Amino acid sequence: MLKGSTGSIRSVAIVGAGLMGRRIAGVMARAGLPLVLTDSQPVVLDSALAEARAMAPGERILGEVDLASAVVDADLVIEAIVEDLDAKRGLFAAARAAAPEALLASNSSVIPISRITEGLAGADRTVGMHWWNPPDLIPIVEVIRGEHTSTESMDAAFAVLEFAGKVPVRVQRDVPGFVGNRLQHALWREAIDLVASGVCDAETVDRVVRNTIGLRLAAMGPIENADYVGLDLTLAIHDQVLPSINSDRHSSPLLRQKVAAGQLGAKSGQGFLPWSDGSRDAAAARLAAHIAEQIKNQ
């Protein structure tokens, strides 16, 4: 039973039953929202339904292979498919045809919602809705205003996310990567460059981050920290260090070399670090336990 206010959202369809889609489904269903989960692959859908239903016992989660049937009665459609612009644009067009009045949301982590909805009817009823992995644990959801997104659509997205127990934040300009991923990949760019330029090895980069800035970021964000230490000191440090920090507008040659060589990280057994059998699962469990502990202690 719905308790509280979901704004104009009374039913939800989630398109894409992969890791993100199935867990988003569990979160929304756990809040009591009637929900349909759809995926074109029946085997994937069956697995996802079992996982989502385990997250929300007793709640109504339906499965549907046909996209139009899944979204036709939904007030909110959340797209959680592969990170491919053409695929997302095609899905949005099909969803809009089947659900002309629905609020369409993309879980893209980097693609601007305005690019996905270019030329789409009812673009005022679209938002970016970037959930972080794992979506059932990370509180923040970035709600991105596209070029044509209405204030009503932003408010509706906010209301339903708050109802589901999430912490939505407003991203008022539709830039690639939004807020979190722009910050994250600025750090990754410099981390990879430190390795590529021989300043230190990969293990040292991770050890330094985990035992310095990583310890305090959950308690004090970068803007508050700049204020905390003093903006005069921040300016002096920037004047010294920024000229030597990597500012490339293209991906690292070392990163490209590793991908070309099939060194893809945990999935291939070798990336910047070696990965043995079971080490990825162990890392995932360690990460989930750490996030859960951080949230419990907030």
Q: Where do the protein language model's features map onto the residues?
A:
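NAD(P)+-binding Rossmann beta1-loop-alpha1 motif at the extreme N-terminus of oxidoreductases
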Residues: 1-55, 98
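NAD(P)-dependent Rossmann-like dehydrogenase/reductase catalytic/cofactor-binding core
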Residues: 2-3, 31, 163-166, 197, ...
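Internal alpha-helical scaffold of NAD(P)-dependent oxidoreductase catalytic cores
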Residues: 31, 141-174, 185-217
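Rossmann-like NAD(P)-binding element
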Residues: 40-44, 56-103, 110-111
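Rossmann-fold dinucleotide-binding core
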Residues: 103-181
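Structural/interface elements that position substrates and couple domains in central-metabolism enzymes
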Residues: 36, 180, 184-188
